[in-house]
Amino acid sequence: MIRRPPRSTLSSSSAASDVYKRQVILRENSANIPSTANVLIEALPYIQKLANKIIVIKFGGNAMIDDRLKNNFARDVVLLKQVGLHPVIIHGGGPQITSYLEKMGIKSEFVDGMRVTDDKSIEMIEMVLGGSINKEIVNLITSHGGRAVGLSGKDGGLIRAKKMVGEGKNKNFDFQNTGMVSSIDPSVVNLLDATPFIPVIAPIGIGEDFKTYNINADIVAGKIAKILQAGKYVVLTNTTGIFDDNGNLIKSMNAEQVRQLVNKGIISSGMLPKVESALEAVSAGVQNVQIIDGTIDHAILLELFTDEGVGTMIRRT
């Protein structure tokens, strides 16, 4: 004999009250659904446009030392790969290098925004960049479900370098083991891009004499964006973007406008290598470069997948 389930002991008014409460909760929860759906719909055309494109990202600044921002960055990168983009990460490590050198009793020196790398510090810098920082980023990406491979410019002959030569008043300055990019061989990056793996590159180069050079990460990122003909080149910084002489954020500017601000001294110091790499990239065919605030949560996604974007866009014309 089939037994019927016992009838509810609740009164009809009590049951009706529970149903009403559930309906109220459902309505409250569904209030956020339209806005969430709108975000996804807004992102769709950008995802379609950038599908199968290489996205070069220069990871640097405070985003590299704040745990929340580091994890958000890793999640963003994994998402890019999942939706069909090909992120290539080039990271800096200035604050970590400076801190480590201070512990070793070595003072950091900068000229025109470039670190001067002496014989005492080059081995330590390579260890910090290619060791602890690079592997931490790889581990973060892995922890959020991605697959990453850490590289330095020495791997696969990726970055060939030569000694940096100063310009203007610093043309005779000896930058010692600070280098310039002489050539990029993207073979190893291209191999990884065709797989589920995300390349994470430390800006260490090797000279023709097999000497190790420390290279500014912004310069390396710009060169790699250029040689890979990246669909996008994104630079994470500690500022909202580029400002005019009145302190107003410039949302979009062309190469000539950037040069004017450099000549006026409005763009200076650590921002110089960033805009120089951006100018080289756009002049070589990269459609545009975004300089964005890496301290904003999910800044990469906001820049790539929303109508408004964040930061400053640099375009060729």
What residues fall within each predicted segment?
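A residue-level signal for beta-strand positions that form part of recognition/binding surfaces
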Residues: 311
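Nucleotide/pyrophosphate-binding catalytic subdomain
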Residues: 17, 21-295, 301, 308, ...
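Single conserved hydrophobic/aromatic residue that forms the stacking wall/gate
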Residues: 1-23
